[in-house]
Amino acid sequence: MATSASSHLNKGIKQVYMALPQGDKVQAMYIWIDGTGEGLRCKTRTLDSEPKCIEELPEWNFDGSSTFQSEGSNSDMYLVPAAMFRDPFRKDPNKLVFCEVFKYNRKPAETNLRHTCKRIMDMVSNQRPWFGMEQEYTLMGTDGHPFGWPSNGFPGPQGPYYCGVGADKAYGRDIVEAHYRACLYAGIKIGGTNAEVMPAQWEFQIGPCEGIDMGDHLWVARFILHRVCEDFGVIATFDPKPIPGNWNGAGCHTNFSTKAMREENGLKYIEEAIEKLSKRHQYHIRAYDPKGGLDNARRLTGFHETSNINDFSAGVANRGASIRIPRTVGQEKKGYFEDRRPSANCDPFAVTEALIRTCLLNETGDEPFQYKN
Protein backbone atom coordinates (compact mmCIF):
# COMPACT_ATOMS: atom_id res chain seq x y z
CA MET A 1 0.00 0.00 0.00
CA ALA A 2 1.60 3.27 -1.14
CA THR A 3 1.54 5.95 1.58
CA SER A 4 3.38 9.27 1.68
CA ALA A 5 6.89 9.73 3.08
CA SER A 6 5.60 12.34 5.56
CA SER A 7 3.25 9.83 7.17
CA HIS A 8 6.27 7.72 8.18
CA LEU A 9 7.83 10.51 10.24
CA ASN A 10 7.76 9.91 13.99
CA LYS A 11 4.57 11.58 15.22
CA GLY A 12 5.65 11.11 18.83
CA ILE A 13 8.57 13.47 18.28
CA LYS A 14 6.26 16.07 16.77
CA GLN A 15 3.98 15.79 19.80
CA VAL A 16 6.84 16.87 22.10
CA TYR A 17 6.85 20.24 20.35
CA MET A 18 3.07 20.54 19.94
CA ALA A 19 2.76 20.19 23.73
CA LEU A 20 4.85 23.32 24.32
CA PRO A 21 2.92 26.34 25.64
CA GLN A 22 2.31 29.11 23.12
CA GLY A 23 1.76 32.00 25.54
CA ASP A 24 -0.94 34.48 24.57
CA LYS A 25 -0.27 34.07 20.85
CA VAL A 26 -2.76 32.40 18.51
CA GLN A 27 -2.08 30.58 15.25
CA ALA A 28 -4.68 31.30 12.56
CA MET A 29 -4.62 29.09 9.48
CA TYR A 30 -6.11 30.96 6.50
CA ILE A 31 -7.77 28.64 3.94
CA TRP A 32 -8.86 29.50 0.41
CA ILE A 33 -10.00 27.92 -2.87
CA ASP A 34 -7.35 28.08 -5.59
CA GLY A 35 -7.70 28.77 -9.31
CA THR A 36 -8.81 25.23 -10.14
CA GLY A 37 -12.08 25.73 -8.25
CA GLU A 38 -11.40 22.42 -6.50
CA GLY A 39 -8.04 22.67 -4.74
CA LEU A 40 -7.58 24.23 -1.31
CA ARG A 41 -4.55 26.20 -0.10
CA CYS A 42 -3.60 27.37 3.38
CA LYS A 43 -1.03 29.36 5.31
CA THR A 44 -0.71 30.42 8.92
CA ARG A 45 -0.10 33.71 10.71
CA THR A 46 0.36 34.61 14.36
CA LEU A 47 -2.22 36.79 16.12
CA ASP A 48 -1.61 38.60 19.40
CA SER A 49 -4.87 37.40 20.97
CA GLU A 50 -7.72 34.99 20.33
CA PRO A 51 -10.23 36.48 17.85
CA LYS A 52 -13.83 36.33 19.09
CA CYS A 53 -15.51 37.12 15.76
CA ILE A 54 -14.70 37.29 12.06
CA GLU A 55 -14.35 41.09 12.19
CA GLU A 56 -11.31 40.76 14.48
CA LEU A 57 -9.34 38.83 11.84
CA PRO A 58 -7.05 40.87 9.58
CA GLU A 59 -7.10 40.62 5.80
CA TRP A 60 -4.04 39.01 4.26
CA ASN A 61 -2.55 38.38 0.83
CA PHE A 62 -0.78 35.69 -1.17
CA ASP A 63 1.00 35.04 -4.47
CA GLY A 64 -1.75 34.25 -6.95
CA SER A 65 0.71 33.29 -9.69
CA SER A 66 1.50 30.13 -7.70
CA THR A 67 -2.16 29.11 -7.24
CA PHE A 68 -3.39 29.42 -10.87
CA GLN A 69 -5.05 32.73 -9.96
CA SER A 70 -2.95 35.53 -11.49
CA GLU A 71 0.10 36.40 -13.57
CA GLY A 72 3.50 36.92 -11.98
CA SER A 73 3.67 40.58 -13.01
CA ASN A 74 0.61 41.45 -10.88
CA SER A 75 0.27 38.52 -8.56
CA ASP A 76 -0.91 39.86 -5.18
CA MET A 77 -4.33 38.50 -4.20
CA TYR A 78 -6.31 39.42 -1.09
CA LEU A 79 -7.64 37.00 1.52
CA VAL A 80 -10.78 38.32 3.24
CA PRO A 81 -11.88 36.21 6.23
CA ALA A 82 -15.42 34.85 5.82
CA ALA A 83 -15.87 32.09 8.43
CA MET A 84 -13.92 30.98 11.50
CA PHE A 85 -13.68 27.57 13.17
CA ARG A 86 -11.71 25.98 16.00
CA ASP A 87 -8.50 24.31 14.83
CA PRO A 88 -8.65 20.54 15.53
CA PHE A 89 -4.97 20.04 14.62
CA ARG A 90 -3.38 22.71 16.82
CA LYS A 91 -6.38 22.86 19.20
CA ASP A 92 -7.70 25.88 21.15
CA PRO A 93 -7.18 28.79 21.05
CA ASN A 94 -5.97 28.36 17.46
CA LYS A 95 -8.29 28.91 14.50
CA LEU A 96 -9.13 27.82 10.97
CA VAL A 97 -10.15 30.83 8.86
CA PHE A 98 -12.00 30.26 5.58
CA CYS A 99 -11.45 33.20 3.22
CA GLU A 100 -12.84 34.77 0.08
CA VAL A 101 -10.24 35.65 -2.56
CA PHE A 102 -10.15 39.06 -4.28
CA LYS A 103 -7.94 40.28 -7.11
CA TYR A 104 -5.61 43.30 -7.02
CA ASN A 105 -8.57 45.54 -8.05
CA ARG A 106 -10.74 44.17 -5.20
CA LYS A 107 -12.99 42.28 -7.60
CA PRO A 108 -13.77 38.65 -6.63
CA ALA A 109 -11.41 36.05 -8.11
CA GLU A 110 -12.91 33.81 -10.81
CA THR A 111 -13.22 30.87 -8.40
CA ASN A 112 -14.62 33.01 -5.57
CA LEU A 113 -18.20 31.83 -6.06
CA ARG A 114 -19.05 32.66 -2.45
CA HIS A 115 -19.28 36.37 -3.19
CA THR A 116 -22.29 36.17 -5.53
CA CYS A 117 -23.82 33.27 -3.59
CA LYS A 118 -23.93 35.45 -0.46
CA ARG A 119 -25.80 38.20 -2.33
CA ILE A 120 -28.33 35.69 -3.66
CA MET A 121 -28.81 34.10 -0.22
CA ASP A 122 -29.40 37.52 1.35
CA MET A 123 -32.20 38.17 -1.17
CA VAL A 124 -34.20 35.16 0.11
CA SER A 125 -33.18 35.02 3.77
CA ASN A 126 -36.82 35.50 4.87
CA GLN A 127 -37.66 32.10 3.28
CA ARG A 128 -35.13 30.34 5.55
CA PRO A 129 -33.45 28.10 2.94
CA TRP A 130 -31.90 25.00 4.51
CA PHE A 131 -29.41 22.70 2.82
CA GLY A 132 -27.81 19.38 3.64
CA MET A 133 -25.07 18.01 1.39
CA GLU A 134 -23.90 14.39 1.26
CA GLN A 135 -20.21 14.45 0.38
CA GLU A 136 -18.91 11.23 -1.15
CA TYR A 137 -15.17 10.67 -1.60
CA THR A 138 -12.69 7.88 -2.35
CA LEU A 139 -9.53 7.07 -0.42
CA MET A 140 -6.49 6.50 -2.65
CA GLY A 141 -2.88 5.52 -2.10
CA THR A 142 -0.18 7.92 -3.25
CA ASP A 143 0.16 5.68 -6.33
CA GLY A 144 -3.41 6.58 -7.37
CA HIS A 145 -4.74 3.10 -6.55
CA PRO A 146 -7.83 2.89 -4.29
CA PHE A 147 -6.91 2.30 -0.65
CA GLY A 148 -7.01 -1.38 0.30
CA TRP A 149 -7.59 -2.69 -3.23
CA PRO A 150 -5.34 -5.53 -4.43
CA SER A 151 -2.27 -4.04 -6.14
CA ASN A 152 -2.78 -6.04 -9.33
CA GLY A 153 -6.56 -6.39 -9.50
CA PHE A 154 -9.94 -5.58 -8.03
CA PRO A 155 -11.81 -6.42 -4.84
CA GLY A 156 -14.99 -8.47 -4.92
CA PRO A 157 -17.97 -6.87 -6.68
CA GLN A 158 -20.13 -4.21 -5.02
CA GLY A 159 -22.72 -5.41 -2.55
CA PRO A 160 -21.18 -5.97 0.90
CA TYR A 161 -19.41 -2.61 1.28
CA TYR A 162 -22.24 -0.05 1.73
CA CYS A 163 -22.43 0.63 5.49
CA GLY A 164 -20.21 -2.45 5.82
CA VAL A 165 -18.41 -3.69 8.93
CA GLY A 166 -15.28 -5.83 9.01
CA ALA A 167 -11.73 -5.81 7.68
CA ASP A 168 -12.85 -7.25 4.33
CA LYS A 169 -15.63 -4.66 3.87
CA ALA A 170 -14.57 -1.33 5.42
CA TYR A 171 -11.37 0.18 4.00
CA GLY A 172 -9.87 3.08 5.96
CA ARG A 173 -12.33 3.63 8.82
CA ASP A 174 -9.60 5.21 10.99
CA ILE A 175 -9.56 8.19 8.63
CA VAL A 176 -13.34 8.51 8.71
CA GLU A 177 -13.47 8.47 12.51
CA ALA A 178 -10.61 10.96 12.84
CA HIS A 179 -12.26 13.31 10.33
CA TYR A 180 -15.65 13.05 12.06
CA ARG A 181 -14.24 13.94 15.48
CA ALA A 182 -12.09 16.74 14.05
CA CYS A 183 -15.16 18.29 12.39
CA LEU A 184 -17.15 18.11 15.63
CA TYR A 185 -14.28 19.80 17.48
CA ALA A 186 -14.01 22.52 14.84
CA GLY A 187 -17.72 23.37 15.06
CA ILE A 188 -18.60 22.02 11.61
CA LYS A 189 -22.25 20.98 11.29
CA ILE A 190 -21.43 17.38 10.38
CA GLY A 191 -24.51 15.18 10.45
CA GLY A 192 -22.98 11.72 10.07
CA THR A 193 -20.84 9.31 8.05
CA ASN A 194 -21.18 5.97 6.30
CA ALA A 195 -19.23 3.59 4.09
CA GLU A 196 -20.39 3.79 0.48
CA VAL A 197 -21.16 1.25 -2.26
CA MET A 198 -17.65 1.04 -3.74
CA PRO A 199 -14.89 -0.25 -1.43
CA ALA A 200 -12.68 2.63 -0.16
CA GLN A 201 -15.53 5.06 -0.88
CA TRP A 202 -17.07 6.93 2.05
CA GLU A 203 -19.56 9.69 2.70
CA PHE A 204 -20.08 12.40 5.28
CA GLN A 205 -23.08 14.69 5.55
CA ILE A 206 -22.99 18.40 6.35
CA GLY A 207 -26.14 20.19 7.49
CA PRO A 208 -28.76 21.27 7.88
CA CYS A 209 -27.14 24.64 7.23
CA GLU A 210 -28.98 27.86 6.45
CA GLY A 211 -27.97 30.00 3.48
CA ILE A 212 -24.28 30.74 2.97
CA ASP A 213 -23.24 28.51 5.90
CA MET A 214 -23.69 25.44 3.67
CA GLY A 215 -20.72 26.30 1.48
CA ASP A 216 -18.55 27.50 4.36
CA HIS A 217 -19.05 24.33 6.40
CA LEU A 218 -18.62 21.91 3.49
CA TRP A 219 -15.44 23.54 2.19
CA VAL A 220 -13.83 23.54 5.65
CA ALA A 221 -14.94 19.93 6.21
CA ARG A 222 -13.18 19.07 2.93
CA PHE A 223 -10.06 20.90 4.13
CA ILE A 224 -10.09 18.95 7.40
CA LEU A 225 -10.45 15.69 5.45
CA HIS A 226 -7.42 16.51 3.30
CA ARG A 227 -5.36 17.36 6.41
CA VAL A 228 -6.40 14.17 8.20
CA CYS A 229 -5.52 12.14 5.11
CA GLU A 230 -2.16 13.93 4.95
CA ASP A 231 -1.39 12.68 8.46
CA PHE A 232 -2.32 9.11 7.47
CA GLY A 233 -0.35 9.34 4.21
CA VAL A 234 -3.27 8.71 1.85
CA ILE A 235 -5.27 10.88 -0.55
CA ALA A 236 -8.98 11.75 -0.56
CA THR A 237 -10.29 12.35 -4.07
CA PHE A 238 -13.61 13.97 -4.94
CA ASP A 239 -13.40 12.79 -8.55
CA PRO A 240 -16.98 11.86 -9.54
CA LYS A 241 -15.88 8.65 -11.28
CA PRO A 242 -12.43 7.67 -9.97
CA ILE A 243 -12.63 4.07 -11.23
CA PRO A 244 -14.15 3.44 -14.67
CA GLY A 245 -16.41 0.46 -15.24
CA ASN A 246 -18.92 -1.28 -12.99
CA TRP A 247 -18.22 0.79 -9.89
CA ASN A 248 -20.31 3.54 -8.33
CA GLY A 249 -19.29 7.14 -8.91
CA ALA A 250 -19.13 9.83 -6.24
CA GLY A 251 -21.73 12.56 -5.88
CA CYS A 252 -22.73 15.31 -3.52
CA HIS A 253 -26.49 14.85 -3.20
CA THR A 254 -28.01 18.12 -2.04
CA ASN A 255 -31.10 18.29 0.17
CA PHE A 256 -33.06 21.54 0.07
CA SER A 257 -36.07 23.04 1.80
CA THR A 258 -37.63 26.37 2.69
CA LYS A 259 -39.76 27.30 5.69
CA ALA A 260 -42.89 26.85 3.55
CA MET A 261 -41.80 23.37 2.44
CA ARG A 262 -41.18 22.29 6.04
CA GLU A 263 -44.63 23.39 7.25
CA GLU A 264 -48.04 21.69 6.81
CA ASN A 265 -48.84 20.81 3.18
CA GLY A 266 -45.35 21.95 2.17
CA LEU A 267 -45.34 19.21 -0.47
CA LYS A 268 -47.15 21.67 -2.74
CA TYR A 269 -44.13 24.01 -2.65
CA ILE A 270 -41.74 21.09 -3.15
CA GLU A 271 -43.63 20.03 -6.28
CA GLU A 272 -43.65 23.62 -7.57
CA ALA A 273 -39.86 23.82 -7.10
CA ILE A 274 -39.34 20.52 -8.93
CA GLU A 275 -41.48 21.76 -11.82
CA LYS A 276 -39.23 24.85 -12.11
CA LEU A 277 -36.11 22.67 -11.98
CA SER A 278 -37.46 20.44 -14.76
CA LYS A 279 -37.41 23.40 -17.15
CA ARG A 280 -33.81 24.41 -16.36
CA HIS A 281 -31.93 21.11 -16.40
CA GLN A 282 -28.94 22.16 -18.52
CA TYR A 283 -28.28 25.28 -16.44
CA HIS A 284 -28.06 23.13 -13.32
CA ILE A 285 -25.87 20.49 -14.95
CA ARG A 286 -23.40 23.25 -15.87
CA ALA A 287 -23.40 24.57 -12.28
CA TYR A 288 -23.03 21.16 -10.65
CA ASP A 289 -19.38 20.41 -11.41
CA PRO A 290 -16.29 22.62 -11.93
CA LYS A 291 -15.98 21.69 -15.61
CA GLY A 292 -19.48 22.73 -16.65
CA GLY A 293 -20.89 19.20 -16.75
CA LEU A 294 -17.92 17.34 -18.26
CA ASP A 295 -16.97 15.68 -14.96
CA ASN A 296 -20.55 14.64 -14.27
CA ALA A 297 -20.91 13.13 -17.76
CA ARG A 298 -18.65 10.31 -16.56
CA ARG A 299 -20.92 9.69 -13.56
CA LEU A 300 -24.52 10.46 -14.61
CA THR A 301 -25.02 7.51 -16.94
CA GLY A 302 -28.39 6.22 -15.75
CA PHE A 303 -26.61 3.32 -14.02
CA HIS A 304 -25.14 2.87 -10.51
CA GLU A 305 -27.94 4.83 -8.78
CA THR A 306 -27.71 7.86 -11.06
CA SER A 307 -29.97 9.58 -13.56
CA ASN A 308 -28.95 10.18 -17.18
CA ILE A 309 -27.21 13.54 -17.60
CA ASN A 310 -29.38 14.41 -20.62
CA ASP A 311 -32.77 13.76 -18.98
CA PHE A 312 -34.60 15.33 -16.05
CA SER A 313 -36.63 13.02 -13.82
CA ALA A 314 -38.21 13.09 -10.38
CA GLY A 315 -39.82 10.48 -8.17
CA VAL A 316 -40.59 9.34 -4.63
CA ALA A 317 -37.77 7.19 -3.19
CA ASN A 318 -36.25 6.82 -6.69
CA ARG A 319 -32.44 6.83 -6.59
CA GLY A 320 -32.31 6.68 -10.38
CA ALA A 321 -33.99 10.09 -10.67
CA SER A 322 -32.54 13.60 -10.92
CA ILE A 323 -34.70 14.67 -7.97
CA ARG A 324 -35.77 12.28 -5.22
CA ILE A 325 -38.61 13.00 -2.81
CA PRO A 326 -37.96 10.88 0.30
CA ARG A 327 -40.78 8.45 1.09
CA THR A 328 -41.40 10.01 4.51
CA VAL A 329 -41.84 13.42 2.85
CA GLY A 330 -44.42 11.96 0.47
CA GLN A 331 -46.28 10.47 3.43
CA GLU A 332 -46.13 13.53 5.69
CA LYS A 333 -46.71 15.95 2.78
CA LYS A 334 -43.96 18.28 3.98
CA GLY A 335 -40.18 18.39 4.32
CA TYR A 336 -37.48 18.59 1.65
CA PHE A 337 -36.29 17.17 -1.65
CA GLU A 338 -32.94 15.76 -2.76
CA ASP A 339 -31.14 16.89 -5.91
CA ARG A 340 -28.96 13.91 -6.87
CA ARG A 341 -27.16 15.60 -9.76
CA PRO A 342 -24.26 17.53 -8.12
CA SER A 343 -20.88 15.82 -8.48
CA ALA A 344 -18.58 15.08 -5.55
CA ASN A 345 -16.21 17.84 -6.69
CA CYS A 346 -18.93 20.49 -7.06
CA ASP A 347 -18.61 23.93 -5.50
CA PRO A 348 -21.39 24.06 -2.89
CA PHE A 349 -21.70 27.81 -3.43
CA ALA A 350 -22.54 27.20 -7.11
CA VAL A 351 -25.01 24.41 -6.30
CA THR A 352 -26.91 26.23 -3.56
CA GLU A 353 -26.99 29.48 -5.55
CA ALA A 354 -28.43 27.68 -8.59
CA LEU A 355 -31.18 26.10 -6.47
CA ILE A 356 -32.14 29.48 -5.01
CA ARG A 357 -32.14 31.21 -8.40
CA THR A 358 -34.43 28.63 -10.00
CA CYS A 359 -36.69 27.61 -7.10
CA LEU A 360 -37.09 30.89 -5.19
CA LEU A 361 -36.15 33.72 -7.58
CA ASN A 362 -38.06 32.03 -10.43
CA GLU A 363 -35.28 32.46 -12.96
CA THR A 364 -35.58 30.69 -16.31
CA GLY A 365 -33.24 30.17 -19.26
CA ASP A 366 -29.68 28.96 -19.55
CA GLU A 367 -27.92 31.93 -17.92
CA PRO A 368 -28.13 33.38 -14.40
CA PHE A 369 -29.88 36.74 -14.12
CA GLN A 370 -27.66 39.73 -13.30
CA TYR A 371 -29.18 41.63 -10.37
CA LYS A 372 -28.31 45.26 -9.70
CA ASN A 373 -26.54 45.99 -6.43
From Swiss-Prot:
Which PROSITE patterns does the entry link to? GLNA_1, GLNA_ATP, GS_BETA_GRASP, GS_CATALYTIC
Entry-linked InterPro entries: Gln_synt_N (IPR008147), Gln_synt_N_sf (IPR036651), Gln_synth/guanido_kin_cat_dom (IPR014746), Gln_synth_cat_dom (IPR008146), Gln_synth_gly_rich_site (IPR027303), Gln_synth_N_conserv_site (IPR027302), Glutamine_Synthetase (IPR050292)
Source organism (scientific name):
Bos taurus
Identify the residues that the record assigns to the GS beta-grasp domain, covering every copy. Answer: 26-106
Required for glutamine-induced ubiquitination by CRL4(CRBN) and proteasomal degradation: annotated span:
2-25
Residues that, per the record, bind Mn(2+) 2: 136, 196, 203
Its GO biological process terms?
Answer: angiogenesis; glutamine biosynthetic process; intracellular ammonium homeostasis; positive regulation of erythrocyte differentiation; protein palmitoylation; regulation of endothelial cell migration; regulation of sprouting angiogenesis
Protein name, per record: Glutamine synthetase
Q: Where in the cell is it found?
A: Cytoplasm, Cytosol; Microsome; Mitochondrion; Cell membrane
- Where does the chain bind ATP? 134, 203-208, 255-257, 319, 324
- GO MF annotation list: ATP binding; glutamine synthetase activity; metal ion binding; protein-cysteine S-palmitoyltransferase activity
State the gene name recorded for this protein.
Answer: GLUL
What keywords does the record list, in alphabetical order?
Answer: Acetylation, Angiogenesis, ATP-binding, Cell membrane, Cytoplasm, Endoplasmic reticulum, Ligase, Lipoprotein, Magnesium, Manganese, Membrane, Metal-binding, Microsome, Mitochondrion, Nucleotide-binding, Palmitate, Phosphoprotein, Transferase, Ubl conjugation
SUPFAM superfamilies given in the database record = Glutamine synthetase, N-terminal domain, Glutamine synthetase/guanido kinase
Q: Which domain of life is it from?
A: Eukaryota
Q: How does it sit in the membrane?
A: Lipid-anchor
Task: Give residues annotated as binding Mn(2+) 1.
Answer: 134, 253, 338
Record's family?
Belongs to the glutamine synthetase family.
- Binding-site list for ADP: 336-338
Which stretches make up the GS catalytic domain?
Answer: 113-373
